[in-house]
Amino acid sequence: MTLRFYDTASAEVRNFVPLVAGRASLYYCGATVQGMPHVGHIRSAIAFDQLTRWLTHRGLRVTVVRNVTDIDDKILAKSEASFASGFQPEPGEIPGEEWWALAYRYEQEFLKAYDALGVSRPTYEPRATGHIPEMHALIQQLIDRGHAYPALDDSGDVYFDVRSWSKYGALTRQNIDDMQAAADADPRGKRDPRDFALWKGSKEGEPATASWASPWGAGRPGWHLECSAMVTKYLGTEFDIHGGGLDLRFPHHENEMAQSQAAGHPFANFWMHNGMVTYEGEKMSKSIGNTISPAEMLELASPRVVRYYLGQAHYRSILDYRPTSLQEAAAAVERIDGFLAKAVARFGTDFGFVEGDYGPSTGAVEAFYAAMDDDLNVPRALAALHETVRAGNTALADGDDDSARKAMNAVVIMTDVLGLNAVAGSEKTSTREAEALAVLVEAQLAARATARAEKDWSASDAIRDTLNEAGVVVEDGADGPTWSLKRD
C-alpha cells in the first residue's frame, strides 16, 4: 500500500507516510457560520470525508478536527444589521438576532446539511469562542519570539510581523513585496500594511459579549489565529494533513502556516485543497443569480444523488454545475441501486458477503484501490465501480450467481468508501432484511429522483404511491426525501 497525495506546499504528489504508524491526523477548515451553507462548503466537507473514509479503510485510525468559526467581523456585522430600523430580512434571516444566536443557528444548519449528505461527524468540532486562552498563549509565544507586536495606535490590536518571518509566502510561492495589504484593520497601527491581526481590540459600538479580556486589552481573536490555536490543542504542534477549499490558500492558510511555524511548530506535513464549484463555467454569484444551494439541490434529488454529484470529480478540480447535473448523477446512482436490487431479488436476504472475495471483479476492485491511493482519484474509482455494476448485471443475466455475488461484494466495498450507502432517514438495523429493504427502497427513490429532475411528476407520484402501498412512507423535506416504515 502506497498512498500518494498532492501537497500544495511542495506543489507535488508525494508518498503519504503518517507521522505515527497506524494513525492519521487531519484538520480541515469548517465554516464561518454567518449564513446558510453553500455548495462550496459541502463539496469541501464531502472531499475530506472521502479522504477520511479511505484512510480508515486502509487501516489507519484517523483523528479528524473540523473547526467552527463562530466569531468574526461578518457575523457581527450581520447581527448588527438585523437590529437596524427598516431591516428587510432575506430568507433565513431573523430581525434583532444577537451575534451568538445567529452563529449557533447557522452552525446547526451546517450540521443538518452535513448529516443529510452522509458526511461523517469529526472526532472534534471545536468552536473558536471556546478556545480564547489557547489563543492568548499562542499570541504571547509570537511576541516573545519577536514575530508579533501590539498595535502602534493603542487600539488593542496585536499583529503578526510578516517581515520577521523569512518564509512568509512559502505556501503560495509569493514574494512578500508583491502581496497586497491585509484588509483586516486600520493600517496606521501596523509596521507593514501586510501585517495581519492576531487579536482585534474592541471597537466602539460592538457588543460587550463579543469581547474577551486579554493582556493587550479587551477584544477578540483574528480569524487566522483561531485555527492555529485549535489545531495545536487537538492534534499537537505537528500533524499529518491540513485541508480546506482552494480559496483559503491565501491569506488564511498562508497566515496559519506562518504564525504556527514562527511559534516553533512544524505544523502540517501535507496541505490539501479542494477545487471550487462553478455554474455553467462561471463563478457562482448572487448578484447575477447563477447560484444553487445544497437545500435547493435536495429539493430536486435524494441526498445520495446530491452526494454523488458533489463528490464525483477529482477533489482538486473545478466541479461545474449544469441544469442536467443532478439528472446525470441520479441516473448513475440508479444504475448502482438497480444492480443491487436485482441481486437482492435473486439471492434473497443472504448476501453471502466475504470481504476480499471478488472473483471476476477482482481487477475492477484493484483498479478502484489504485485510483483512491493515487491522490484520491474518485473519477477513476467511480469508473471501476460502474464497471463492476455492468459485470454484475451481465452475471445475473447469464445465471452466473457466483460471479454476481462477488460483484455485489465489490460494489458494497466501493460504495462504503465513497459514502454512497449513507442514507439519511433510513431505519438502520443490523439485520440482513433491513439492509435488503434499504437497497430496494433506495433504488426506487433514485428512479423517483430521476423522474423529478425531468419534471415527470406523474411517474414520481406513481413511485411514491407504490412505496406507500408497500408500507414505506416517503417524506420530502428541505434536506431531500426520507423514508420510514408505517407503524402498526
Swiss-Prot record:
Residues noted as binding ATP in the record, renumbered to the chain: K286
Annotated binding of Zn(2+), by residue: C29, C227, H252, E256
Keywords: Aminoacyl-tRNA synthetase, ATP-binding, Cytoplasm, Ligase, Metal-binding, Nucleotide-binding, Protein biosynthesis, Zinc
GO biological process: cysteinyl-tRNA aminoacylation
Principal location listed in the UniProt entry: cytoplasm
Motif range ('HIGH' region): 31-41
Co-factor binding details: Binds 1 zinc ion per subunit.
Matches recorded under InterPro entries: Cys-tRNA-ligase (IPR015803), Cys-tRNA-synt_Ia_DALR (IPR015273), Cys-tRNA/MSH_ligase (IPR024909), CysS_C (IPR056411), Rossmann-like_a/b/a_fold (IPR014729), tRNA-synt_1_cat_dom (IPR032678), tRNAsynth_Ia_anticodon-bd (IPR009080)
Subcellular location: Cytoplasm
EC number: 6.1.1.16
Cysteine-cysteine disulfides: none
GO molecular function per UniProt: ATP binding; cysteine-tRNA ligase activity; zinc ion binding
Catalyzed chemical reaction(s): tRNA(Cys) + L-cysteine + ATP = L-cysteinyl-tRNA(Cys) + AMP + diphosphate
Domain of life: Bacteria
UniProt key word S-adenosyl-L-methionine: no
Sequence motif 'KMSKS' region, location on chain: 283-287
Obligatory cofactor(s): Zn(2+)
One Gene Ontology CC term in the entry: cytosol
Family in the record: Belongs to the class-I aminoacyl-tRNA synthetase family.
Subunit structure: Monomer.
Matches recorded under NCBIfam families: cysS (TIGR00435)
Name under which the protein is recorded: Cysteine--tRNA ligase
Lineage of the species this protein comes from: Bacteria, Bacillati, Actinomycetota, Actinomycetes, Micrococcales
Gene that encodes the chain: cysS
